[in-house]
Amino acid sequence: MIDVPHEVIEKLQIFQDLVQKWNKAINLISENSTQNFWKRHILDSLQLIQYINDKEIHLVDIGSGAGFPGIILSIAGVASTSLIEADLRKCIFLEKAAKISNNNIQIINQRIEKTEISCNILTCRAFSNLNTIFDCTKNISVQNKFLLPKGKSYLSEIKEARKKWLFKCLINQSITSKESKILEISDLTKII
């Protein structure tokens, strides 16, 4: 299990309240997932922190939506986070949510394909398959790794991606679901 300081838990509770308040207006998360919010969203995002050895990094979260996992990781201690989100309404929410964290959070309201930025780690949650993630982030310089929570189709996604890309991939077990994995992908190179 993940050891989380009391102060972080308090901030995550504030974030949960904010998501649930805004969800009525802009549909940040599915109504079905509100009953199991802590496990489904908070813990599922928070578990990524165990794969971030140095918190003094710049992390990019693409398709940030409701702030999972980017805001959660910032609250948990990641020093600098950029959230890339095309939907202006969600960016307004993210601006409010960013104030909960003591760390630096930048909100970028534009399409991922048009974003040129450098980071240590790139993450996203419930965004797309590996090929799409790699294709749309070609202008983002990822220095260390992609850190990606994936569901039961992770093996077929890896197989498909290897047709177009060379990469190293560590597969870790998710703590929120037996079917889910956390992929650590590095040394990405396009082959076709």
Curated annotation (Swiss-Prot):
InterPro entries reported in the protein's UniProt record: rRNA_ssu_MeTfrase_G, SAM-dependent_MTases_sf
Pfam families for the chain: GidB
Matches recorded under SUPFAM superfamilies: S-adenosyl-L-methionine-dependent methyltransferases (SSF53335)
EC number per UniProt: 2.1.1.170
Annotated family: Belongs to the methyltransferase superfamily. RNA methyltransferase RsmG family.
GO MF annotation terms: rRNA (guanine-N7-)-methyltransferase activity
Function noted in UniProt: Specifically methylates the N7 position of guanine in position 527 of 16S rRNA.
Primary location recorded for the protein, binned into one broad class: cytoplasm
Gene3D superfamilies associated with the record: Vaccinia Virus protein VP39 (3.40.50.150)
PANTHER family: S-ADENOSYL-L-METHIONINE-DEPENDENT METHYLTRANSFERASES SUPERFAMILY PROTEIN (PTHR31760:SF0)
Compartments where located: Cytoplasm
Enzyme class, first EC level, given as a word: transferase
Catalytic reaction annotation: guanosine(527) in 16S rRNA + S-adenosyl-L-methionine = N(7)-methylguanosine(527) in 16S rRNA + S-adenosyl-L-homocysteine
Keywords assigned: Cytoplasm, Methyltransferase, rRNA processing, S-adenosyl-L-methionine, Transferase
GO cellular component, one term: cytosol
Name of the protein described by the UniProt record: Ribosomal RNA small subunit methyltransferase G
Residues annotated to bind S-adenosyl-L-methionine: G63, F68, I112, E113, R125
Keyword Transferase listed: yes
